[in-house]
Amino acid sequence: MRYKKYFRKTSLKQKGVGDFFLDQIQSKKPRVFLEVGVFHGVTARNVCELLYSIHGNDFNYIGLDLFKESDEINSEVIPNTKFNNPLKTIYFNYIRRINPYSVEGVEYLLKKFKKNVSLIKGDSNKILKKIDMSKIEYVFLDGGHDYLTVMNDLNCCYEVLINNGIILCDDYDLSYAPGVKKAIDEFTFKNNLKCEIICNNRFAKIQKI
């Protein structure tokens, strides 16, 4: 399945990266998927389309995000939520009249899978501790890039690995957010986990040895 952008912003926009990502999900075929860092929901829609093609309606997607504008968050590294393309700005502001980076905006994009999707607004440092990880099979971690946030997110998702699931972390090689790599390296070393650095050092794929 090819990765589609759905006329929105996505952090997996570089050529081939989205397709590579979907191939990773395809190889595992999870029924319960958690994404930390939903952004405009493009990756969420692609994941739902893929899981539907594999399992029909027998899948669940859980998405967690702050759902705040980039200029509202000074302490974190997140993608710019503003469009560079004026046509997209006009479409969402004046035609669709919806903020694509909002719970409502993402729900609109995912309405086809309304019964399969749960969106949670909040800080992963607080919310992840409340999520039952026992049934989650795959985690895509692309939330806060601060060292402490990444470490918190990894620790909270550790049960997924114990149950033979996978955590795929984005931005392992992001030079202006070194806390991502530092947290992943320390977490995998401490817990004696297998960590593959893939897609030209972009993703860190973590699982049990």
Where are these regions (language model features)?
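S-adenosylmethionine/decaboxylated-SAM
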Residues: 2-11, 15-209
